[in-house]
């Protein structure tokens, strides 16, 4: 490990690896560090991604694709089921990944592009001089180091310290954190070509239960509930109840517990010499909590802007503002619209959800026009259409794609 690089990336998740790969391909000297000894472990999500956007970053590989999903089922509290094709199911439906292999494949691509990758290497602080980030202090195998750089990219996840060290407000209110629990189960006995989403305030207050196929009759089965709506029952207890009632033959072989920020965007994600990407920048989707593709998209933008700034010889916040502007115009717009949807739906009663599902149950979501969708929503819930009016204006203008591309 050298004492100076052009770019240091903190965190080797999807966002960090794409940032490192992009910067290295631009000819920059890049160091990417990961605090854990194994990249991709532990798993923090349901592992679903949309096909179109994934292919913008990496060619799909059977080694890390567990399931090729053709659609999703949304199940209302009374059991009414809506089927949606993959193209209409959102940014987390398409492929179900094996994250442990996928994350390492991305890190390997960054290394092949020229980045230096160091595991079991923990950032302990930033080096800040004249109000500018100029490197990091780190711990590697029990030894302390100071490594300087022209730009630091913080991709250190939900618990990010990098942004906080730089004076960026990244704290999230408990009410804006989705508390999650997930099992990997065998003997799942579900259709391995579909993802399942169960809605209802009894099974998941202000949230949902998901089932993502993993191949070989296995599935990720998880729950996410909004912190502000969590009652006496903990997510793990609600999940246990769901599995007992709906998957009595399932066998638990792995468990993950964590939290996902669903707060929408934070005020800023840059400082002099610094950019934040992924969960560190609160770029996850407020509805689903999914953030793999958003992190990768943001990482690519950050890597490109890092190269531009370094070539220009100016890594100030004014130059890095281009990163802020670019991700907010794309990723940020989708996040803001998802936040409107989330804030609308968390106030729905089970009766509201049942009514909506009943009105949409026979719709073919692969061929429906926007106008017919609006008519169906209006029939189901007139207030809903009014609450979401701003989003539909953007869709009609073609400014939002919601990651529904095939």
Curated annotation (Swiss-Prot):
One example GO MF annotation: oxidoreductase activity, acting on the CH-CH group of donors, iron-sulfur protein as acceptor
Keyword Lipid biosynthesis: yes
Essential cofactor(s): FAD
GO terms of biological process kind: glycerophospholipid biosynthetic process; membrane lipid biosynthetic process
InterPro entries, per the entry: DGGGPL_reductase (IPR023590), FAD/NAD-bd_sf (IPR036188), Geranylgeranyl_Rdtase_fam (IPR011777), Geranylgeranyl_reductase (IPR050407), GGR_cat (IPR054715)
Keywords: FAD, Flavoprotein, Lipid biosynthesis, Lipid metabolism, Oxidoreductase, Phospholipid biosynthesis, Phospholipid metabolism
Pfam families cross-referenced by the UniProt entry: FAD_oxidored (PF12831), GGR_cat (PF22578)
Substrates-to-products reaction catalysed: a 2,3-bis-O-phytanyl-sn-glycerol 1-phospholipid + 8 oxidized 2[4Fe-4S]-[ferredoxin] = a 2,3-bis-O-(geranylgeranyl)-sn-glycerol 1-phospholipid + 8 reduced 2[4Fe-4S]-[ferredoxin] + 16 H(+); 2,3-bis-O-(phytanyl)-sn-glycerol 1-phosphate + 8 oxidized 2[4Fe-4S]-[ferredoxin] = 2,3-bis-O-(geranylgeranyl)-sn-glycerol 1-phosphate + 8 reduced 2[4Fe-4S]-[ferredoxin] + 16 H(+); a 2,3-bis-O-phytanyl-sn-glycerol 1-phospholipid + 8 A = a 2,3-bis-O-(geranylgeranyl)-sn-glycerol 1-phospholipid + 8 AH2; CDP-2,3-bis-O-(geranylgeranyl)-sn-glycerol + 8 AH2 = CDP-2,3-bis-O-(phytanyl)-sn-glycerol + 8 A
Cofactor remark from the record: Binds 1 FAD per subunit.
Enzyme class: oxidoreductase
Binding-site positions, FAD: 15, 34, 45-46, 48, 99, 123, 279, 291-292
Enzyme Commission code: 1.3.7.11
PANTHER family: DIGERANYLGERANYLGLYCEROPHOSPHOLIPID REDUCTASE, GERANYLGERANYL DIPHOSPHATE REDUCTASE
Role, per record: Is involved in the reduction of 2,3-digeranylgeranylglycerophospholipids (unsaturated archaeols) into 2,3-diphytanylglycerophospholipids (saturated archaeols) in the biosynthesis of archaeal membrane lipids. Catalyzes the formation of archaetidic acid (2,3-di-O-phytanyl-sn-glyceryl phosphate) from 2,3-di-O-geranylgeranylglyceryl phosphate (DGGGP) via the hydrogenation of each double bond of the isoprenoid chains.
Sequence similarity: Belongs to the geranylgeranyl reductase family. DGGGPL reductase subfamily.
Protein name in UniProt: Digeranylgeranylglycerophospholipid reductase 2
Native species: Methanococcoides burtonii (strain DSM 6242 / NBRC 107633 / OCM 468 / ACE-M)
